[in-house]
Amino acid sequence: MQLNVTHRTNAERLEKHNRELETALAKKTEEHKEQAKALLLLQDDMLANQIQLNVLEQKTEALQQENETLVQRLVAKAAADADKMNDANAFLER
Protein backbone atom coordinates (compact mmCIF):
# COMPACT_ATOMS: atom_id res chain seq x y z
CA MET A 1 0.00 0.00 0.00
CA GLN A 2 2.82 2.39 0.90
CA LEU A 3 4.48 1.71 -2.46
CA ASN A 4 1.27 2.56 -4.30
CA VAL A 5 0.98 5.89 -2.44
CA THR A 6 4.61 6.69 -3.20
CA HIS A 7 4.08 6.00 -6.88
CA ARG A 8 0.98 8.17 -6.86
CA THR A 9 2.86 10.98 -5.12
CA ASN A 10 5.73 10.72 -7.59
CA ALA A 11 3.30 10.67 -10.49
CA GLU A 12 1.50 13.74 -9.15
CA ARG A 13 4.79 15.53 -8.64
CA LEU A 14 5.89 14.65 -12.18
CA GLU A 15 2.55 15.76 -13.61
CA LYS A 16 2.82 19.05 -11.75
CA HIS A 17 6.38 19.53 -13.00
CA ASN A 18 5.22 18.67 -16.53
CA ARG A 19 2.44 21.30 -16.32
CA GLU A 20 4.95 23.87 -15.08
CA LEU A 21 7.25 23.06 -17.97
CA GLU A 22 4.38 23.30 -20.46
CA THR A 23 3.39 26.67 -19.00
CA ALA A 24 6.98 27.90 -19.19
CA LEU A 25 7.25 26.64 -22.77
CA ALA A 26 4.03 28.40 -23.74
CA LYS A 27 5.28 31.61 -22.14
CA LYS A 28 8.63 31.38 -23.94
CA THR A 29 6.86 30.61 -27.21
CA GLU A 30 4.68 33.70 -26.80
CA GLU A 31 7.73 35.81 -25.95
CA HIS A 32 9.46 34.49 -29.05
CA LYS A 33 6.44 35.40 -31.20
CA GLU A 34 6.41 38.92 -29.76
CA GLN A 35 10.13 39.30 -30.34
CA ALA A 36 9.73 38.05 -33.91
CA LYS A 37 6.99 40.64 -34.50
CA ALA A 38 9.18 43.37 -33.03
CA LEU A 39 12.08 42.26 -35.20
CA LEU A 40 9.92 42.42 -38.32
CA LEU A 41 8.77 45.92 -37.40
CA LEU A 42 12.36 47.01 -36.88
CA GLN A 43 13.40 45.48 -40.18
CA ASP A 44 10.51 47.24 -41.93
CA ASP A 45 11.50 50.53 -40.33
CA MET A 46 15.12 49.99 -41.30
CA LEU A 47 14.12 49.26 -44.90
CA ALA A 48 11.90 52.35 -45.03
CA ASN A 49 14.73 54.46 -43.61
CA GLN A 50 17.16 53.02 -46.15
CA ILE A 51 14.77 53.87 -48.98
CA GLN A 52 14.37 57.41 -47.63
CA LEU A 53 18.13 57.74 -47.35
CA ASN A 54 18.58 56.60 -50.94
CA VAL A 55 15.98 59.09 -52.16
CA LEU A 56 17.60 61.90 -50.19
CA GLU A 57 21.04 60.97 -51.50
CA GLN A 58 19.70 61.08 -55.06
CA LYS A 59 18.11 64.47 -54.42
CA THR A 60 21.33 65.73 -52.87
CA GLU A 61 23.31 64.56 -55.89
CA ALA A 62 20.85 66.24 -58.26
CA LEU A 63 20.99 69.48 -56.26
CA GLN A 64 24.78 69.41 -56.21
CA GLN A 65 24.85 68.98 -59.98
CA GLU A 66 22.31 71.77 -60.42
CA ASN A 67 24.34 74.01 -58.12
CA GLU A 68 27.50 73.30 -60.09
CA THR A 69 25.71 74.12 -63.34
CA LEU A 70 24.33 77.36 -61.91
CA VAL A 71 27.74 78.39 -60.58
CA GLN A 72 29.29 77.71 -63.98
CA ARG A 73 26.58 79.77 -65.68
CA LEU A 74 27.08 82.59 -63.17
CA VAL A 75 30.84 82.58 -63.69
CA ALA A 76 30.35 82.56 -67.47
CA LYS A 77 27.89 85.47 -67.26
CA ALA A 78 30.23 87.41 -64.98
CA ALA A 79 33.07 86.80 -67.44
CA ALA A 80 30.87 87.90 -70.35
CA ASP A 81 29.83 91.03 -68.45
CA ALA A 82 33.46 91.75 -67.64
CA ASP A 83 34.40 91.31 -71.31
CA LYS A 84 31.62 93.71 -72.33
CA MET A 85 32.77 96.24 -69.77
CA ASN A 86 36.37 95.90 -70.93
CA ASP A 87 35.27 96.34 -74.53
CA ALA A 88 33.26 99.43 -73.58
CA ASN A 89 36.22 100.88 -71.67
CA ALA A 90 38.53 100.14 -74.56
CA PHE A 91 36.11 101.87 -76.94
CA LEU A 92 35.92 104.92 -74.68
CA GLU A 93 39.69 105.10 -74.37
CA ARG A 94 40.15 105.48 -78.15
Swiss-Prot record:
Protein's cellular compartments: Preautophagosomal structure membrane
Annotated protein name in UniProt: Autophagy protein 16
Organism (species): Yarrowia lipolytica (strain CLIB 122 / E 150)
Membrane topology: Peripheral membrane protein
GO cellular component, one term: phagophore assembly site membrane
Any single biological process term in GO: protein transport
Coiled-coil region(s): 2-77
Keyword Ribonucleoprotein: no
Classification via Pfam families: ATG16
Organism lineage string: Eukaryota, Fungi, Dikarya, Ascomycota, Saccharomycotina
Annotated keywords: Autophagy, Coiled coil, Membrane, Protein transport, Transport
